[in-house]
């Protein structure tokens, strides 16, 4: 079942006289339970694509359906409600509230639902245990490491069981061990909960944890790689080869 269907996605910036087309007719379909990475050189449009797919930014033309709902037809208020219920986000900057504990931060998405306290606590325990942060639940963000902050941010994205999670360079601010810890946990949650994840990354190691990698070049899909039954190491080598053909991938914000 397709969770995300994007058809003929166009995104332009500027005026008619000085228009820059960043996305040029992209089609993407993401099935339930897929862990998909979007890669591309700096300026290729990968971050713009994630922002448009996740409704952070408006598209110029095309169709985006999530769980069958046409995102482009939703009014601002409806879109905000849809986003709260169906979408989860993991950003590079963690975005945790300093005045709340780790547990309180993670439970934020449930505070807008009518879920009973006991059920919320059970959900919290499950996801926090999976991500290895249950023991630090009563600490504040300034008392924990960057890797722990990002795992708390990931737990907050998973807690309300969204239809799809969008991750923008989630390992960008982490050292290699913290990054591999986070990616391993995301992979586990993807497999255990059949969570659907779309992640933008410039890092081939991060992309190798995914089941499919979409390469963007000049605002269009250049090619795709499927992991299939390959080992992560073999998939990593395939990603590196494709990246080499693309001419290297720099960090892109």
Curated annotation (Swiss-Prot):
Asked if the record carries the keyword Cell wall biogenesis/degradation, the reply is no
> What CDD domains does the record point to?
ABC_MJ0796_LolCDE_FtsE
Task: Spell out the molecular function terms from Gene Ontology.
Answer: ATP binding; ATP hydrolysis activity
Query: What keywords sit in the KW lines?
Result: Antibiotic resistance, ATP-binding, Nucleotide-binding, Transport
Binding-site residues for ATP, renumbered to this chain: 40-47
Briefly state the protein's biological role.
Answer: Part of the ABC transporter complex BceAB (TC 3.A.1.123.5) involved in bacitracin export. Responsible for energy coupling to the transport system.
Family indicated by similarity = Belongs to the ABC transporter superfamily.
Q: What is this protein called?
A: Bacitracin export ATP-binding protein BceA
This chain's source organism reads Halalkalibacterium halodurans (strain ATCC BAA-125 / DSM 18197 / FERM 7344 / JCM 9153 / C-125)
Its organism's taxonomic lineage begins at: Bacteria, Bacillati, Bacillota, Bacilli, Bacillales
Its gene name is: bceA
């Amino acid at each position: 079942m397709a969770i995300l269907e994007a058809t003929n996605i166009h995104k332009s910036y500027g005026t008619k006289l000085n228009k820059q087309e960043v996305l040029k007719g992209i089609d993407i379909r993401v099935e339930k339970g897929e862990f998909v990475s979007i890669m591309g050189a700096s300026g290729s449009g990968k971050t713009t694509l994630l922002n448009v797919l996740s409704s952070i930014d408006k598209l110029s033309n095309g169709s985006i359906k999530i769980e069958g709902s046409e995102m482009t037809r939703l009014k601002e208020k409806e879109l905000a409600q849809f986003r709260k219920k169906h979408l989860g986000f993991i950003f590079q900057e963690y975005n945790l509230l300093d005045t709340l504990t780790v547990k309180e931060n993670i439970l934020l998405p449930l505070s807008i639902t009518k879920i009973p306290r006991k059920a919320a606590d059970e959900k919290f325990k499950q996801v926090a245990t999976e991500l290895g942060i249950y023991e630090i639940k009563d600490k504040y963000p300034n008392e924990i490491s960057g890797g722990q902050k990002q795992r708390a941010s990931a737990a907050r994205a998973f807690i309300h069981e969204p239809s799809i999670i969008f991750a923008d360079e989630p390992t960008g601010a982490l050292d290699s061990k913290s990054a591999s810890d986070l990616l391993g946990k995301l992979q586990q949650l993807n497999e255990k909960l059949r969570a659907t994840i779309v992640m933008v990354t410039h890092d081939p190691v991060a992309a190798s944890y995914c089941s499919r990698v979409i390469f963007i070049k000049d605002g269009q899909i250049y090619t795709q790689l499927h992991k299939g039954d390959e080992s992560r190491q073999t998939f990593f080598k395939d990603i590196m080869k494709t990246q080499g053909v693309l001419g290297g991938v720099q960090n892109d914000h």
